[in-house]
A protein has these predicted regions:
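Beta-rich strand-turn-strand
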Residues: 113-126, 132-136
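Membrane-proximal basic amphipathic "stem/tether" segments
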Residues: 1-10, 159
Length: 159
């Protein structure tokens, strides 16, 4: 794992493939987080307790822009079963999955217990409210607050 200055790694953090993780300066990954995919985390970021970043087995990447945060319990998925085809399990190699990178631009924030599915490009300045669900390929506008299930724009954000 490569990391910059002032990096703080909490207790009981699991990083399954540290060789696929890069972290900038002034970053904190809090207790009880689990990272099992490729990650590029910018500077001045925080990942709060209980956050889970998973899927893709190194083929896909989670990228977090500088000055961004993930609140407690956020789940970022780079791969997921589509739950509409024959088998609903992750243990069988022939299962059709939804897969893709997830990118958060600079100055973004994701609220507590939100779920972000594969294949999302979240632009600069977007915030996502607590308990929100972001389906694959959702189209965001920069500097906007989103929330809900289904997710929807709430209002513009100050720069």
């Amino acid at each position: 794992m490569k990391h910059g200055k002032n990096f703080i790694l909490g207790e009981y953090v699991i990083i399954k493939k540290p060789e696929l993780v890069e972290v900038g300066d002034n970053v904190r990954i809090a207790d009880f987080c689990r990272i099992s995919s490729a990650c590029k985390i910018g500077s001045d970021c925080e990942i709060a307790p209980g956050t889970y970043i998973a899927g893709g087995d190194g083929k896909y990447t989670f990228e977090m822009g500088s000055y961004s945060s993930l609140a407690a319990g956020v789940k970022i998925w780079l791969s997921s079963n589509d739950y509409v085809n024959e088998l609903v399990t992750h243990s069988v190699p022939c299962v059709k999955e939804i897969q893709g990178n997830v990118r958060l631009g600079k100055y973004t924030g994701v609220g507590t217990n939100s779920v972000i599915m594969p294949g999302n490009d979240i632009p600069e300045g977007v915030t996502i409210g607590a308990l929100s669900f972001v389906p694959s390929g959702y189209k965001f506008e920069p500097w906007t607050v989103y929330a809900g299930q289904p997710i929807r724009p709430i209002k513009k954000r100050n720069r």
